[in-house]
Design a protein with these regions (language model features):
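An amphipathic alpha-helix adjacent to DNA-recognition modules
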Residues: 2-6, 10, 15-16, 27, ...
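Hydrophobic alpha-helical connector segments
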Residues: 46, 60-91, 98, 107-111, ...
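Amphipathic C-terminal alpha-helical segment
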Residues: 137-154, 171-178
Length: 178
């Protein structure tokens, strides 16, 4: 059920995901879905949990054996590629999710991988929450603007700005104020 809902989100947008739309896709009646998910919020949280697991796997593969600037670029590129290839799933991560997704192993994996990335910088662990918020807002903000076409009518193209933004993040993380 969750996999089909995620595919629906990727094909038609996250807001298109409803219990009835998923039921139609599965060629079943909507009430039969309630044996799998409690309600629409649980369905959406299931997509978020799936997205977190997929994203964690991509980040893990991308940053393995890397540190510092190289790891940061790989980390950000993994996010960007995921957002492009799985837009509905990525959108599921841009909302407040329920406790099940927040406390999932996949969420813990993403946090741990982000922590591993940050160990390549001179940032005390007590500052990590601030850095994680900066990374999330910068990367996801850029991806959201890019996805919505906000950069379509200006030069240079977003492909030129992306590495510069990640380099700017690297410079900031390398000189993080404590």
């Amino acid at each position: 059920v969750i996999t089909e809902a995620a595919a629906l989100a990727d094909e038609h947008g996250f807001t298109a995901v409803t219990l009835s739309a998923v039921a139609r896709r599965l060629e079943v009646r909507t009430p039969s879905l309630y044996s799998h998910v409690r309600d629409r919020d649980a369905l959406l949280d299931g997509i978020a949990s799936l997205a977190l697991a997929e994203l964690a796997a991509r980040i893990s593969a991308a940053i393995a054996g890397r540190s510092g600037r190289d790891a940061l670029h790989a980390f950000a590129d993994a996010y960007r590629t995921y957002a492009r290839e799985s837009p509905g799933r990525w959108q599921s991560l841009q909302r407040r999710t329920g406790e099940t997704a927040v406390r999932s192993q996949a969420a813990r994996d993403v946090v741990a991988l982000t922590g591993a990335l940050l160990r390549g910088y001179p940032i005390p662990e007590t500052e990590h929450v601030h850095v994680i918020r900066l990374l999330g807002s910068t990367i996801n903000g850029y991806l959201s603007l890019e996805r919505n076409g906000s950069f379509d009518h200006s030069d240079p193209p977003p492909e030129q700005s992306w590495p510069r933004i990640i380099d700017a993040l690297d410079a900031l993380l390398s000189a993080w104020p404590t």
